[in-house]
Structures are given as structure tokens and as C-alpha cells.
Amino acid sequence: MSMFCYQCQEAAGCKGCTVRGVCGKTEDVAKSQDLLIYILKGISVYGVKGREVGVINKEVDNFMVEGLFATITNANFDREVFIERIKRGLQLRQELKEQVIKAGGNVENSHANKNWLDKMLSFVGLKKEEETKLPDAATWFADNVEEFNAKAEKVGVLATKDEDIRSLRELITYGIKGLAAYVEHAHNLNFDNEEIHGFMHKALAATLDDTLTVDDLVALTLETGKYGVEGMALLDKANTQTYGNPEITKVNIGVRNNPGILISGHDLRDLEQLLEQTKGTGVDVYTHSEMLPAHYYPAFKKYSHFAGNYGNAWWKQTEEFEKFNGPILMTTNCLVPPKDSYKDRVYTTGVVGFPGLKHIDADEKGEKDFSSIIEHAKKCAAPTEIEKGEIVGGFAHNQVFQLADKVVEAVKTGAIKRFFVMAGCDGRAKSRNYYTEFAQKLPKDTVILTAGCAKYKYNKLNLGDIGGIPRVLDAGQCNDSYSLALIALKLKEVFELEDINELPISYNIAWYEQKAVIVLLALLHLGVKNIHLGPTLPAFLSPNVANVLVENFGIGGITNVEDDMKMFLG
């Protein structure tokens, strides 16, 4: 059986990748990821049972988060990494099972009739006692790659035959993957939330439960959104308490004459360590793609060698990494399989991986030694300039709340007629040029609220301002969509509205991978309706599941700029 993956927006033919991922993922990597997810779901069965008797294994919880994060689109392409995670996952599953048994938990086959009356009726033959077996994912074991390969053929997405059940199971799983990314970043800053871990176990274990109906899974999907909000709140707290609240900042997009290191991804703790270790070395540090918003945090402004942002969204890296000349550090997704011409300059860390690239691990305390990449940088030429100028950002919730009076007055006077939330992801599809054209053609009395790398479609267009308020307000990384939600809730409060959907806010969101999925589910949990997703709707939404989202939440796609503009503006 060939691979099957449809977790991202680039799913081939908007159906699924079956030979090789459009992302560059090979068939053997895809299947090893399938098996790892299967093992993680099996661990979650014991994670749920453990919590029933007070057993919480933090090593297991962290392993779950890292494993889920590693399977996100464009994070890790190294099959050997997944094989090792599968082996370790099986070990941890057994260890957790033994801990649950020791605590008095029931880890064997359970019975549906648990109360005393049912048991008595069953004993006298008046009621059948149904045995519910542990799912195979909680019991299957192997210790060699041959058996791993054989099992991986049987446990992929298509193992669930019912199209709607499959669709909802995958929607939940992808949401949990996105949530795992945010939890991992918070964990790296020593912030955690046990309740979120507990829910992740519950949700993943539920995807193995064949007794759950479509309605059950729809409810669980919305509950996933609830924990998406909590996960983004946790990361917002971690980032702001560690580095301060983002503030309005001009970021240089040109270059200096020193050699440099380009840091990409999302992990601010990695950036902090790199900046500390490059002090006084003569090596500058530049951000790339989703690392741009790091410039908005006060704590990073003390580094004189924090030079600016180089390049654009992740998908342009094959040409931009070539021109940067120095080494690149990938802290998280999105990694594109590198060209041979610059492959020796790419370093990975955290959950990122690609065969042949140099990987930098953390020690037991979470500290990383970046001396090798710094020494590499010293031998390289300064970056080739690809653009000049500045871009402005830093409009997260705290900063916007400080401007609240100005914003509210602009709305009341009609200077601002409508806000457009255009958060989300960028990607290589030409159809995404829609978002550039859409931004250009928006009326001058509208303001764009953005977060995530979708901003690169319009953050350099110089769209002007309204009474000193920039028409593009960049809150930060994709997880900072949380700020956009808080801003909307604040406006609802200020204008004394009962429903968030009464606000003059439209949602035209570009999605790409699984973090966008958890952001979407979080918005649905908050009651936001009439969200439009593009450039295509997710391939993993079956017609019936898509219809549920349309009927209950007004989810829609996009068509063309002219027609959509009329639709949004009425």
C-alpha cells in the first residue's frame, strides 16, 4: 500500500499525497509518522487510565508533545528519528502501564456493565455483559524495523473506513498536533499546563474508540478548540512573562557587513540562547519567516547584533538561504528539503530533522551549545542584500489595548469601517497571490489584523494608515492569533455587544498546516462564525463534516478577489 497523507493544504489534487508528499516527505517517512502517531494514541489510553488513579508521568507527556510536533508538516524528514521515537514510545507505554497497575488502575480489558445491578443481572443471565477490549494501539508490540514497516502499512489514515469518522478523527488529531507545538514552546520556557496534557491524552485515545459517533466526535472537536485557546494563552503567558509584551517596532529588512546566522522557525528560547552566545563574536543574527516577531519583544532589543529580518515566508527559503551566505538554524517547521548548494550550512535543533543535516541537541537542563554554528558563520561572507527598508509590527493584545481609545474613536467616527483578520500561513501555491491582491484592493477605511507568515503577502505593500493607526497590524507568530481573539473580545466589551459576530470584523484566513487547524478550532470555540478559509478547504474534511461546519459555523472558502470583496463588504 502506498502512503496517504492529507494533513496540509498542499495535499495533492486537494485529495491526498500518495507517492511522495508535496512537502518533500518520502513514503517511508510518511509511514513511520503514521506508526508513531498510532503508538502515541496507544500511550494515551494509559495516559487516561493513569489520570483516573492519580498517575501523571511528565516524561511521557513531554514525549507525546515532541512526537506530535515532529509529525507536523515540514518539521522532520528523517526516518531514523521516527524509528527511534517508535522504539522509545513502546518502552514508555509499557512503563506507564506498569505505573498504572501499581497505582491500582485497571489496564486490562474492561467491561461495559460496571454498576452492581448490571453485574448481578449479568451473573443470572438476564443481561449480557459486553467485553470492551483495549485498542490494538495500546497492546501491539514489536522490536524490529521489519515489523514496524509491516504494521505501518495497516495503521495509516485510511485504516478508518467510515469517511466521516475518519474526517473527524483526523481533524482532532491535527488540532492536537498544532496544540502540541504551542505546548512545546511554552514548556521550553518552563511554563506548563497539566490540564492540557490530560486533554491531549483523552482526545487521542478517543480517536481509537469505535463506539463514538459522529456527534460525539463533533463535540470533541469543539472541546479541542477550547484547549487550543488555553494552549495559546499558555504560550502567550510564557512569551510575555519571559520577554515582555510586544511593542510597536520597526524592523530592518536590509543587511549589514558582518557575517550572520539566520534563525528560522518559532522557538524564542533558541533565539535567546543564540543571541547570548553570539555576543562579542562579530556575528550578526537575522530572523527569517515566523521568527520575525521576536524583534517586537523588549528583551531582545538589548542585543546590538540582532540585525533584522532576512527574506520572506518559509517557502522562498531555497532561493533566500542560497543568498544569505551564512549558516541557518531551523528551530521548528517550516523546513524545505535543502539544495545541495547550501545544505552544509543548515543546522537543525528541537524536533526538526533532515538526513545529512547537522543537529544540535539540548542538554538535560535545556541548554544548547551553538559554538559550531557560530564558528561556521565566522568563515562565511556577509549576507547578500535582497531588499532594503523597514517593516512595522508588534501589535499584540497589550499594545493594541494601549491604543484602544484611538481605535474605538476611529470606529465610532467611521474612519475605520471594518477590520479584516487575515492571519494564518503562506505557501508556494500561486493561488495565494489572491491575498496580496485582496489586501491591495481593500477600501482605505479598513484595517488588516494579522498573525503568522500569511503577513508576508502584504506586510511590505505600504498600505498606509488611518489617523496614525497602520492599516496592517501584525500581532506576531501564528500562535499570536490569540491576540487577535483578545482584541475582538475587547472590542465586543467596549461596544457592549452580546455576540462577537456583531463586530465589524471579517475573517479571511489562509491556512497551511496543523497549527492553523488548532487556531481555527479555537476561533470556533470562541463562537466566531463566517470564517473563510483558503486557498482551498482542507482535504481531510469529508463532504458531510464540511457541511456540519458550514451549517453551524458558516465556514466558507474563497473564490476571487472581486466577488469575495463584494461578499465581505455587503
UniProtKB/Swiss-Prot annotation:
UniProt keyword terms in alphabetical order: 4Fe-4S, Cytoplasm, Iron, Iron-sulfur, Metal-binding, Oxidoreductase
Cofactor: [4Fe-4S] cluster; hybrid [4Fe-2O-2S] cluster
Chief place of localization: cytoplasm
Classification via Pfam families: Prismane
Binding site for [4Fe-4S] cluster: C5, C8, C17, C23
Co-factor binding details: Binds 1 [4Fe-4S] cluster.
Compartments where found: Cytoplasm
Transmembrane spans: none
Positions where Cysteine persulfide occurs in the chain: C425
Positions with a binding annotation for hybrid [4Fe-2O-2S] cluster: H266, E290, C334, C425, C453, C478, E513, K515
InterPro entries in alphabetical order: HCP/CODH (IPR004137), Hydroxylam_reduct (IPR010048), Prismane-like_a/b-sand (IPR016099), Prismane-like_sf (IPR011254), Prismane_a-bundle (IPR016100)
GO biological process, one term: response to hydrogen peroxide
Reactions catalysed: A + NH4(+) + H2O = hydroxylamine + AH2 + H(+)
Entry GO MF terms: 4 iron, 4 sulfur cluster binding; hydroxylamine reductase activity; metal ion binding; peroxidase activity
Assigned EC number: 1.7.99.1
Leader peptide range in chain numbering: none
Principal EC category: oxidoreductase
Family note: Belongs to the HCP family.
PANTHER family in alphabetical order: HYDROXYLAMINE REDUCTASE (PTHR30109:SF0)
Biological role: Catalyzes the reduction of hydroxylamine to form NH(3) and H(2)O.
Protein name (record): Hydroxylamine reductase
Biological source species: Clostridium tetani (strain Massachusetts / E88)
Gene, per the UniProt record: hcp
